[in-house]
């Protein structure tokens, strides 16, 4: 097992290096001069030249990349131009909010998706299967940001059941019930598409397992159907379901970017959008690399969990 984990960690290195190259080149190709954006009304040619020299932006592009990469490997993400504070400090402050939102959405889509998939497979071609399939297709078809805006109009503006935006109330909020009220709509909007995908693939995995000989044997021995479904079939199907959960975790994490903008959630996604608008290069580059590293790390955990369920994967 230790060798397999080490192999997965080593394989993650070129992925992360590739991400640093891509995000660096994308930020370099964005129109506009960062120094001009930072200086604003003070952007005289002399000031722009002085700031570019101070930030190292007058160096060749390849040299800028290797300087940034070298600092990154030492844990130095640089300093935000717009916020005038270390990039890593800003990311860590924002990441807790993103983790709460994405983590809640991931738990919801995992539980609801697997439950819907199992019930749909157990009642194949029945009323429950058709109803779940209809709801799943509808959920997959609706963009999360559009669903979020519709939820705001209905549940926040019209019915006033939930707050419109933010993470806490500005008037004496900050407790757990207040957080739950603010979290409900964005977490649901973020989880809908992933729930549908997990449900569809869980249904397929369950149907494949239910056709296998050991399930027929269990039923022939008189094992209760509930135990056959939830005890034997689901356990065997989890080998195929777990990789799906890992992939959807990435989609949930990336989807948090626009959901945070719709609901004004103070997370990393909103920070990245603000950084792009302000041409805060180091903030955007550091944020993308940090989120990518979290996604890669989570997928390694998923692969290890899958290898525990199916040792053949390690070979």
Regions found by a protein language model. Name each.
Residues 2-4, 13, 93-128, 144, ...:
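Alpha-helical transmembrane segments of integral membrane proteins
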Residues 15-66, 159-179:
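Hydrophobic alpha-helical transmembrane segments of membrane transport/permease proteins
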Residues 19, 36-39, 63, 78-81, ...:
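Short, hydrophobic secondary-structure boundary micro-motifs
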Residues 22-29, 70, 134-165, 189-195:
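Membrane-water interface segments at the C-terminal ends of transmembrane alpha-helices
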Residues 43-44, 56-57, 74, 78, ...:
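Residue-level marker of structural boundaries
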Residues 58-114:
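An internal, D/E-rich "acidic patch" concept
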